[in-house]
């Protein structure tokens, strides 16, 4: 297009540049956009086709693998008929039956016993003429057979018992200790019952000296009520008598006292027969212990001292001006023998326990005490 063909727009000057036209550029840009969209759509379609194709191949491969696994695990089976068995050989002719022989009863009893648990093979039965009815069986032979039968039965039982014991230690651990059952019962008339296990507080009236056996007494310091706590059975001030023995030995610090009877201020008496205890319930009564040390070792120590000084004086007089002293030489054998004899006579002196009057002790009730024969309850 030349300049001559361009129409002159009104309001413009000659030589002035006019407005550019955009019609041609706009149409070219639209073509580019359409071409780009077409290319993008084509690529998307190709990608979708590729994805569907890959998924179909994966499903086909999975189906083929599953089919192969299933077909490979099925074993091949063949059905064949077993070969026919060979014909049985002809049976030999049966021998004629032997005449029946009567058998004595002891022999039949012996044959009915089970075999002993050993590895001895069973022997064939041999016809014994002594078992026939024509033979005479005496009483002694019958007793012998009975003893043999009992011996075989006992041996069989012992073998079975040993087999159970040899089963191992686990078998013994699976069996617990069998204990006898105990039945519960109710205490009768608890209003007049002082139950076993109660403790009576008591103060000594007499001094205890274990040198010789003796008697003892104490006074109850607290009221004792019935098992249900409703009835006063033993009043405070009741007297309890007992006895003790001279049985204290070396190393012992308690004495055993047996309290035998209780007497209330109202004249009610009952046999107690229960042991003494300390205020906390410990068995036995504690006290002061005299071990008699000087009585046991004083004579021997005195004789040993006399012997030592005698040897020293003898050596001092006979040794002149020597400054050395030997206490293991010289005479004094008779003095040494006297010391051994004295120690032998006094070493076994037993200790003595002393417990003064007025000290608090306890008495453990060892049995149920029933006062229903002397007491009664009346409604108010």
Swiss-Prot record:
It is found in: Cell membrane. GO terms for cellular component: plasma membrane. The chain crosses the membrane at residues 33-53. The keyword Signal does not apply. Residues 1-26, 78-102 are annotated as: Disordered. It is a single-pass membrane protein. Residues 81-100 have a biased composition (Pro residues). InterPro entries: T4SS_VirB10/PtlG (IPR047695), T4SS_VirB10/TraB/TrbI (IPR005498), T4SS_VirB10/TrbI (IPR042217). The keyword Transmembrane helix applies. Keywords: Cell membrane, Membrane, Transmembrane, Transmembrane helix, Virulence. Its main location: membrane. Belongs to the TrbI/VirB10 family. NCBIfam families: T4SS_VirB10. This is Type IV secretion system protein virB10. It comes from Brucella ovis (strain ATCC 25840 / 63/290 / NCTC 10512). The lineage of its organism: Bacteria, Pseudomonadati, Pseudomonadota, Alphaproteobacteria, Hyphomicrobiales. The gene is virB10.
């Amino acid at each position: 297009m030349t300049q001559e063909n361009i129409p002159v727009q009104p309001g413009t000057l000659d030589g002035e540049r006019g407005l550019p036209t955009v019609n041609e550029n706009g149409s070219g840009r639209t073509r580019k956009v359409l071409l780009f969209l077409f290319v993008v759509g084509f690529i998307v379609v190709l990608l979708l086709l590729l994805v569907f194709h890959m998924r179909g191949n994966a499903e086909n491969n999975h189906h083929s693998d599953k089919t192969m696994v299933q077909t490979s695990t099925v074993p091949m089976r063949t059905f064949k008929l077993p070969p026919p068995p060979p014909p049985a050989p002809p049976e030999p002719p049966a021998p004629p039956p032997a005449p029946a022989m009567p058998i004595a009863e002891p022999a039949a009893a012996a044959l009915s016993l089970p075999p002993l648990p050993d590895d001895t093979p069973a022997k064939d039965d041999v016809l014994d003429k002594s078992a026939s009815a024509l033979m005479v069986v005496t009483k002694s032979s019958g007793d012998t057979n009975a003893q043999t039968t009992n011996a075989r039965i006992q041996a069989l039982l012992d073998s079975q018992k040993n087999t159970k014991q040899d089963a191992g230690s686990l078998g013994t651990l699976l069996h617990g200790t069998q204990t006898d059952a105990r039945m519960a019962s109710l205490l009768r008339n608890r209003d007049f019952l002082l139950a076993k296990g109660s403790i009576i507080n008591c103060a000594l009236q007499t001094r205890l000296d274990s040198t010789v056996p003796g008697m003892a007494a104490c006074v109850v310091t607290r009221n004792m009520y019935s098992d249900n706590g409703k009835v006063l059975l033993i009043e405070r001030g009741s007297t309890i008598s007992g006895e003790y023995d001279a049985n204290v030995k070396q190393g012992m610090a308690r004495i055993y006292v047996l309290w035998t009877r209780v007497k209330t201020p109202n004249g009610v008496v009952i046999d107690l027969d229960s042991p003494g205890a300390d205020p906390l319930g410990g068995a036995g009564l504690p006290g002061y212990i005299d071990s008699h040390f000087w009585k046991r070792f004083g004579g021997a120590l005195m004789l040993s001292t006399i012997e030592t000084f005698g040897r020293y004086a003898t050596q001092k007089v006979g040794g002149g001006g020597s400054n050395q002293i030997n206490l293991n030489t010289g005479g004094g054998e008779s003095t040494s023998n006297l010391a051994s004899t004295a120690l032998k006579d006094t070493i076994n002196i037993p200790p003595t326990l002393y417990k003064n009057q007025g000290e608090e002790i306890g008495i453990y009730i060892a049995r149920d005490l029933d006062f229903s024969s002397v007491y009664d309850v009346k409604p108010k």
